[in-house]
């Protein structure tokens, strides 16, 4: 049997695309050593400069490790965005494809031909897919593309306009995954709260929640990548009222200064953002994640200081911060740029603040009883079982280390009630109290 090595870079949306490719390459034996693979695939990210560099380095590194007569295939966002340039500049690569042909990857490899469809691939209920990284959790991609006009973001230029999956397609996929033992789901898209806007429906995500709740066997669900102008008060209240959807609110804000929100074309002012955030925060056991960009053109010291004070005071649970990346095909590309030195200085300042905020979020968990999912052996040592809080998204929100159990041996993928005993530098030490019925 021929061997396959696949490297998936970037976001969880890319991961789903990689899992689709794996589903269509099930005839291959997966291996974790590039030097032994007959086919090597890199699913690239082309979002910001650092991601582009990571993708190029990964391609060149795999070329150095590959064996003679193997096939190196490059796909994904970077390829879609820089197709002509990369095909000229990367003679190391054997086959190229973009973001439209994941279901045809087997055909492409068999025929040894490049494929570039004109439209972005949209998953259906019939898509073959092999879930990786968990036996209980899966990401569910509900749409592709984006209709927003953010000044810094090039995604619409290579992913295209919003294209939503039909609700029936998503429900069919969920039912299949539940039948296979999956019970924890994260719903994703470039802009999840605009789901079905392209079909003229403004409450599409609410209707999807209604339908998901009818499926027996789902233990938890959360929605990522809410957008400030498409996320309504009604949507937030519907999530809060749900017995299946966790009060997990992931809304990348990018800034809080009204001046910067206008320049960045975010569509909502700080008053509107704070109203929504306070509603989210009022929910029982709420968990708030966001992201910010520093150094975007037009950001003054006053804007940056306002952002820092807001980050200090609001009480987010998790925050990602990025230095502004100058990207072609964006409105900000031709604006007067903030000097790199200033951007780096601001990034260091806010990263320190963010670190302290996240530490407080972990610290407040001590003494709480939480539902957690066992995810496997911990890298911290043989005496710990790794787990995640049921509220959290997979991998990005933290790790719980269980080293005591009042309910015998712990099963992977099973839900337990745990008492959080200690915060160990953003990892929580816990004791398992009881097994929780998955139904």
Curated annotation (Swiss-Prot):
Molecular function terms from GO: 4 iron, 4 sulfur cluster binding; aspartic acid methylthiotransferase activity; metal ion binding; protein methylthiotransferase activity
EC number(s) from the headed UniProt entry: 2.8.4.4
UniProt similarity note: Belongs to the methylthiotransferase family. RimO subfamily.
Role summary: Catalyzes the methylthiolation of an aspartic acid residue of ribosomal protein uS12.
Reaction catalysed by this enzyme: L-aspartate(89)-[ribosomal protein uS12]-hydrogen + (sulfur carrier)-SH + AH2 + 2 S-adenosyl-L-methionine = 3-methylsulfanyl-L-aspartate(89)-[ribosomal protein uS12]-hydrogen + (sulfur carrier)-H + 5'-deoxyadenosine + L-methionine + A + S-adenosyl-L-homocysteine + 2 H(+)
Keyword Disulfide bond on entry: no
Protein name, per record: Ribosomal protein uS12 methylthiotransferase RimO
Note on how the cofactor is bound: Binds 2 [4Fe-4S] clusters. One cluster is coordinated with 3 cysteines and an exchangeable S-adenosyl-L-methionine.
Residues binding [4Fe-4S] cluster 1: 11, 45, 77
Superkingdom of this protein's organism: Bacteria
NCBIfam families cross-referenced by the UniProt entry: 30S ribosomal protein S12 methylthiotransferase RimO, MiaB/RimO family radical SAM methylthiotransferase
Location within or outside the cell: Cytoplasm
Sequence positions that bind [4Fe-4S] cluster 2: 146, 150, 153
SMART domains hit by this protein: Elp3
Gene: rimO
Pfam families: Radical_SAM (PF04055), UPF0004 (PF00919)
